[in-house]
């Protein structure tokens, strides 16, 4: 079985990262590409399902998993834990399915240290002006909050050079095509192609 690839995708808020991933998943079959499902200790909300939106676990279980080094990365947000299970990711990758993980640069650093074969993608907005427009377009934040989110976005963008690939999301369809092209290129890497075409290669090179 050919191992799937873990893709780490990061971007400042407003760059369109989540929209790109969701659009990609709509065009890729589930047996081919999936999004990572995190563990969390927060309460399940109406309409959510265990194993579909999150793996909902008690605090004691989560903290036991931390002690067992079971997470590729984790963080505490307010009173709740969120984390990416190493075992859950590896089980999906072992079936040949590519997994996409939407995460910030700090989480990306943790994951690359534990899974150096992961591929990382950073998404940039086309300009600060466009990023500001997108943040304001949500019509839900005050000027103070928008200013703080912009400052956080700039801080996030300073880490773009730590990634393998860079996408500028100016035109959404072009950015989506860029994302698909990265996946296609990774699937054409020599190591993966040798496994996929092992029988053919053996016949071609046979005396």
Curated annotation (Swiss-Prot):
Q: Which InterPro entries match?
A: GK/Ca_channel_bsu, Guanylate_kin-like_dom, Guanylate_kinase, Guanylate_kinase_CS, P-loop_NTPase
Asked whether the keyword Cytoplasm is assigned, the reply is yes
Q: Which GO terms describe its molecular function?
A: ATP binding; guanylate kinase activity
Give the E.C. number(s).
2.7.4.8
From which domain of life does this come?
Bacteria
- Which UniProt keywords are present, listed alphabetically? ATP-binding, Cytoplasm, Kinase, Nucleotide-binding, Transferase
One GO cellular component term:
cytosol
The cross-references to Gene3D superfamilies, in alphabetical order and at most eight, read:
Guanylate Kinase phosphate binding domain (3.30.63.10), P-loop containing nucleotide triphosphate hydrolases (3.40.50.300)
Domain Guanylate kinase-like: residue ranges: 4-184
Q: Does the keyword Cytoplasm apply?
A: yes
Enzyme's top EC category: transferase
**Reaction catalysed?**
GMP + ATP = GDP + ADP
Tell me where it resides.
Answer: Cytoplasm
Identify the SMART domains for this entry: GuKc
Which positions does UniProt annotate for ATP binding? 11-18
**Family the UniProt entry places it in:** Belongs to the guanylate kinase family.
The protein's job, in short, is: Essential for recycling GMP and indirectly, cGMP.
**Protein name (record):** Guanylate kinase
Which species is this record about? Sodalis glossinidius (strain morsitans)
